Amino acid sequence: MTGYSISWHARIVGLLGCGLLLSACASNEVAMPAQQAGLGCVDDSAHCVSERGNALKMLMADKSRSWVKQPPTATAYASGVRIWAFKQKKHELTCDELSHARREADGAAPALRGAKGGLTPAQISRGIMLAQDVSKELGNEFGRRCRA
């Protein structure tokens, strides 16, 4: 082979590698860990409903609750999975985790209102309503168990 053909092959392999990387980045579900795959799926299609259900099951099964302090995205707020998991886990959360969860729920409205495209007004509204309700529940649980 000539120097030209090696260079040409290297360029082709490089371009293919870049293409694969970009395609992985373009799809939220490929780039995300399994437990977070449903967090970015916000429409009402059967696929997204299933993905959100699977994500919720994985969050609920995580005994370490490592997800509690991971920062959410606007689509994670809109999907409702994390907020719903906080609602379901509120009796198991430590006082620190309850405080963090409530701050996250309280942060949903500004995050959703500031979301740049991709969310419908109905998705934003539903996410905000759920977060407000769960914030109240988390606050009540915190007040019941975590008084200073």
Identify the residue ranges that each predicted region occupies.
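C-terminal motif of bacterial Sec signal peptides marking the signal peptidase cleavage site
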Residues: L21-A24
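Bacterial N-terminal signal peptides that target proteins for export
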Residues: T2-L15
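Extended, charge-rich alpha-helical interface modules
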Residues: S5, A26-A148
